[in-house]
A protein has these predicted regions:
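Ser/Thr/Pro/Gly-rich low-complexity linker/stalk segments immediately outside membranes or between
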Residues: 22-40
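A cross-family detector of function-defining hotspots
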Residues: 26-30, 57-221
Length: 221
């Protein structure tokens, strides 16, 4: 009898517990909008991806959406002014986990001045340098709009999974023996399919797509 009661208790618990841990409808809607393949073209030529509107949503908006552990810094290679980036090491894009990098829209003069006032500069990998912003510049950076987003999913993606979620690409460019760029100019999306490493999803406004694909030697618009 005790065994029967114990089994019934476990069954009831299994049925009831999920109700308490189900996301609120509002939270569920937000997560669905943040899924990597939910991309909305806007009348102004921008796109909304991962729940953010490129060239409109700010780094502060990105921090609100993806958590307080966002690290903001200027990342540069030798001879370059660099880019103002925000990095989230562990993020949830809807129900998909991965790493996120947000690139802020800032001109070279602003970035150079921020580098001069940096609280700390250190090497990341090889010759790449990271400049930690001063408190005042960090406050300014958080008000700047996001012009590009890069997402590295934790799980490996294959071509079939990508086409199922994003549709067939408008063009493909093979960069080397293990990387292929799947291009979606209407969405402002470049997916790098990598047979040796992690896939990379790059989002920009469609009007900026030529800048993204320029280094690939393509005329995709």
């Amino acid at each position: 009898m005790k065994l029967v009661i114990a089994i019934l208790s476990l069954v009831i618990l299994a049925l009831v517990l999920p109700v308490f841990f189900m996301p609120e409808p509002a939270d569920l809607a937000i997560r669905q909008q943040q899924l990597p393949w939910v991309i909305e073209a806007r009348p102004d030529g921008n796109t909304r991806a991962l729940g953010l509107t490129l060239n409109v949503s700010t780094l502060a908006d990105a921090k609100t959406a993806f958590g307080p552990d966002m690290v903001v810094a200027i990342v540069s290679e030798p001879g370059e002014v660099g880019a103002l980036e925000a990095y989230v090491a562990s993020a949830h894009a809807g129900f998909i986990t991965g790493k996120l990098i947000f690139t802020a829209r800032a001109d070279e003069d602003m970035i150079a001045a921020m580098r001069e006032r940096a609280a700390k500069t250190e090497y990341m990998e090889s010759t790449t340098r990271k400049a930690t912003l001063s408190p005042a510049d960090l406050s300014t950076a958080m008000t700047l709009p996001v012009r590009a987003i890069a997402f590295i999913p934790s799980a490996n993606l294959d071509r079939d999974a990508i086409v199922e979620r994003f549709g067939a690409p408008a063009d493909e460019i093979r960069a080397n023996d293990h990387q292929t760029h799947l291009l979606y100019p209407d969405k402002g999306l470049d997916i790098i399919l990598d047979t040796r490493g992690k896939e990379l999803l790059q989002y920009v406004a469609p009007r900026d797509f030529a800048r993204l694909t320029g280094p690939l030697g393509t005329a995709a618009q």
